[in-house]
Amino acid sequence: RSKITDVDRKAINEESEEFYKVITATKESFDQLKDAKKSLDLSRKIIEMQEDTLQKDLKKQMKEISSSLDSLSNLFMDPEGLKGIQRNPNTLNNRLWTARRYLGSSWTIPGQNAMKAVTNAREEAEETIKAVNEFIQVDYLLFQETINGLRVKIFKEMQPVKIE
């Protein structure tokens, strides 16, 4: 049985704290995608009240945005609704869990395998967060400006009903 030292505890805590910064940033990035999806759903309802010619163009843009949101979400984790046990090693969620397991598997200073797993998870998180940020700051922002620029018609025009 190996003895645990204060140096070991301190090293584990420091690495864990640094790693949780990656997890926190990843969660914030994924939350942005979820918020964008919610806004997209609201936009769909607003678009239904617009003129047909405008609807057609906006629906095409929405389809592209929705597709991008799904693709980016799939970088984080597998799509919802899959049956059975799914183990996709290529998702960011899997990489984060792998690194977390390595960090928590020993009572001594994290070894090379743990540090390699943490490095891989951090690199993947940075790439994924960068992709989300680019999407939010370019494509989604343009779409958002388009929707915000609409003269919103929430109510359909109604005429009194008469029996003739």
Say what each PLM segment does.
Residues 1-21:
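Low-complexity, Pro/Ser/Thr- and charge-rich linker/hinge segments at domain boundaries
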